[in-house]
């Protein structure tokens, strides 16, 4: 599961959950893949994400020191080198084994072989 995907996931479908975002991320294993950098595509992705959730995800893979704590005001004013760091976090890091945890109910959703399992039994929905 790429960190870009994590940024869009929530547990709002659970009973008694009002926000369910961002899901806490516990990473047991991840791999780094080499996905080709595209400046324009990276800027489009960054315009769509919630920056605070990216900070949380970056911390889960011990990479939070690579990005600024505050969201940059204009993505298109960043250098290619700066954008490559964001691209690396969003697209090159692939969580293979771990957990997503609902911030409200603490329901745990496993990540196995890079696939998050968001299915829950009817009693938990």
Swiss-Prot record:
CDD domains noted in UniProt: Trm112-like
Superkingdom in the source lineage: Eukaryota
Subcellular location: Nucleus, Nucleoplasm; Cytoplasm, Perinuclear region
One GO MF term attached to the UniProt entry: protein heterodimerization activity
The TRM112 domain, residue ranges: 2-121
InterPro entries: Trm112, Trm112-like
GO cellular component: cytoplasm; nucleoplasm; nucleus; perinuclear region of cytoplasm; tRNA (m2G10) methyltransferase complex
Keyword field contains Cytoplasm: yes
SUPFAM superfamilies: Trm112p-like
An example Gene Ontology biological process: positive regulation of rRNA processing
Gene3D superfamilies attached to this UniProt entry: 2.20.25.10
UniProt entry keywords in alphabetical sequence: Cytoplasm, Nucleus
Pfam families given in the database record: Trm112p
Function: Acts as an activator of both RNA and protein methyltransferases.
Family under the similarity heading: Belongs to the TRM112 family.
Name of this protein: Multifunctional methyltransferase subunit TRM112-like protein
Source organism of the structure: Caenorhabditis elegans
């Amino acid at each position: 599961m790429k960190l870009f995907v994590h940024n869009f996931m929530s547990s709002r479908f659970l009973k008694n959950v009002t926000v369910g975002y961002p899901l806490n991320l516990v990473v047991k294993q991840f791999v780094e893949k080499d996905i080709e950098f595209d400046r324009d595509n990276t800027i489009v992705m960054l315009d769509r994400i919630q920056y605070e959730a990216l900070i949380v995800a970056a911390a889960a893979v011990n990479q939070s020191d690579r990005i600024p704590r505050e969201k940059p005001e204009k993505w298109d004013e960043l250098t290619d080198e700066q954008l490559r760091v964001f691209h690396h976090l969003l697209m090159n890091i692939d969580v293979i084994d771990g957990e997503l945890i609902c911030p409200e109910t603490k329901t745990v959703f496993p990540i196995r072989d890079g696939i998050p399992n968001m299915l829950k039994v009817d009693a938990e929905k």
